[in-house]
């Protein structure tokens, strides 16, 4: 750690060759020194954070440890940035990031990048709950979900499977320069910061300066992690008149030294360093540092920090060193001895490559890669074993930093890997010399996608990242979506989650269904259930509700009339012209009182016999026709709720009528969306859309409606069981192709092949593997692949027992809730009581 300790931590003190004192059971000198330090001083004395200049936003550091001569206290200055981890990378990103080395750094400067898997998700959960309407059942559902997820931040959320923790990945990027700066140095530092932020931005990492309150909160998390079941609800208060180090560490922090780790509260902190690297690596592969995407057993079972510390060497001195070492290694590799020692040949080849890189202008840097684990007490060995297995599966070898835990722990704190600590690492031979290209490709800047900005849906990634999903956050296109989910994969739960999220945050939702899948949930949530039966007395005359007779309205009315005339086949342009003439004429004459009867009469009086035939075909929908009661007179279809389910099951045997009813309902919903507030979310869900959209004239209607609702802040969401369902008719295909969002739950192989053949979006080898790996764990979660403008991600919908009861389709559970409500329970309390009774019966109470 510190230069004065170099003599105390030599190879003779390592576990492999302990000295006599160690063999007698006494602690090694390094542990003894720190143990003695912690008896008299706190951890704060080992931190260098001194002050912050609000004008320049630079940090000034000075190490204040008691065993350092006050006249020799190492000083540094610099800045700390936070960047959002990227969910992926390519060669172009790596090339852009390489630009960070095209700067003129003072010799000895350090760059540090830390990726922190933070368990502090309480703030995100609170934002999600807080977005729900206060006192509603939706708020209760959100709170129960949040409570459930918060249990999975320190220990696995699922007891009978591999470790799964819920997290929020954060990434910091720091540059520290040696010495006490003058005005010129400060000016250079500010220029460097601007340049680095520009490089990061160009690579897809918009950076922000970490101000003292945020730094104190982050350091507090790392040096004083919350106990299991608790969270950091209060951030440390920043006082510009008190050294930062003293504000960063609570006086209650009790740090204990162990041979292979530290103990802080109920955490057994353990630090590891990279001992050997894979022969080939790319930046995109660093996303596996947080856990294997495909193998559940290769995960990190606790909070952790993955760090790269980079020391900027003297370029000329480094080149001389490379030339010297390369010549020796190459000479040895060419010697007769190398025939018997293959390692010498490999070493020679490696140094020849380094020499060639340097000769071609590629610069070198000295780096350290480390991982700090934060397992619960008693679980450190297990966590160490699992993270070693993860890294080894990728070609990296990790080793525990025995007797060097404090130094490694400090190096994993944001901005703490400074020029002085880097020099100590160099003295202990802990820095590797590699090309700057390799530095960039091993930076821990990748994690899982954290979603969109608004807290609508809340999912979590396979490696635990909590993510918000909101289709209405799409600034690049429309808000429409398509859901593809095979039987048993959790489609109803997922659609219910979308609908309850929209309604719970103050929006409106309509569900058009055949099969009564949403009847019980609708009634349980106090929604409006509209059933189209012979005796329902519902009138849906489309003319009654027209407010503005614009081009879009006319287009959709034409498609409705055309659907009634030719439910399966097509209609030529001439016939569509006659329909338009009829609609325009009757609207001018009767306005909102117009009906299908008026359209039919107009066509029957037309001189062309083909138009007359069309009038005859419309007879079933006129006042004397079999379906006239649905269309004659004023529309009685009203939407009196924020959640409306329209059930078309009874029309299933009357396909020609069902197709017209669907189009009129969609038109009516669009009109409601138009009347609503633009900033209020509005969504219409059509389940088993391919079957409902089988009408021959629906395609143009769908295209117009999908485009139209975007202007009203509305969205359509269709759902089918397989991709090829969307290709069973032109209207369903139009819905598929006009949806910017695609949600794919578990699929059969043939459905994935259909997706690939459709060209809807590119499905290469990797994405194909991702889609085939999508799974549903009953009682645990449903996975969904989310495709949106700009990329894709996998999220898990994890449902708590309370929400599961709300979404239940079991008649006995709905009946039980209704009985409790009749006894005076609120709806939210009734569901709560049902969950309590079930839990009690499980435990025999």
Name the predicted role of every residue range.
Residues 159-167, 471, 549-601, 724-726, ...:
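P-loop NTPase motor core of the ASCE superfamily
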Residues 85-87, 117-119, 175-179, 375, ...:
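Short, flexible loop/turn elements at secondary-structure junctions
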Residues 86-88, 119-121, 180, 515-517, ...:
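Conserved nucleotide-binding/hydrolysis micro-motifs of P-loop NTPases
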Residues 60-76, 84-86, 91-105, 197, ...:
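Glycine-rich phosphate-binding loop of nucleotide-binding enzymes
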